[in-house]
Amino acid sequence: VATGLGVRLEKPVKVIDKVLYRADGAGYLPPGYAHLFVVSSEGGAARQVTRGDHDFNAPAAWLPDSRSVIVAANLDADADYKPLETELYRIDIETGATIRLTQRSGPDRAPAVSPDGRHVAYVGFDDRKLGYQNSQLSILDLASGTSRVLSAALDRSAEAPELDGNEAIVFEYEDRGSTTVARVAATGGAIRILATDLG
């Protein structure tokens, strides 16, 4: 590439116009955004569901009617300046219409939907601008829009929630370098350890 200054560059100049352009362990991030696509179980072409200059973060959780999914995203205009901030959104698969389900300062992510489609388990925290904050396990009632924290008594970061029927949530947390799997009722209460020392 000729520079006009009598110097020839081996590689083209990289123009960066985004706040988030590089990540530890990944290097320069490719341009573009992460979006949801669907493919028929019969096969065929993928169809894009979400659009715009925002990332829609995996995993997405299907509702039982297969008409919508719940996913974490930051759809604010200044999303690049709030890298931790995500909310849960319900997205209509046919229209791409979004409905915000959570709203707080801090990340909400990793949704898991109950088999009856009435509740969503997820993890996140109220961002107090600290160096590290534990992710709390919460459950959202889709009809009322209210959320309740289920792991407030646990001084560990809850991750990977999965519904155990409609009555309980199974999740994991790291404890002294080892993974523990635990279970808590959807209505709250004591956390019961299911397995420890999982690596």
Model-derived regions, located:
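Short loop/turn segments that connect beta-strands within beta-propeller blades
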Residues: 40-44, 92-96, 141-145, 185-189
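Blade-terminus and WD-like Trp-Asp/Gly-His loop motifs, strongest in beta-propeller folds
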Residues: 60-68, 111-119, 161-168
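Catalytic core of nucleotide-activated saccharide and alditol-phosphate transferases
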Residues: 193
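A short helix->beta-strand "capping" segment at the edge of beta-propeller domains
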Residues: 44-50
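Hydrophobic "anchor" residues
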Residues: 46, 68, 98, 119-120, ...
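Structured loop/turn residues at beta-strand edges in well-structured enzyme cores
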Residues: 31, 44, 64, 115, ...
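A flexible loop/linker signature enriched in serine peptidases of the S9 family
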Residues: 1-35, 50-57, 72-87, 100-112, ...
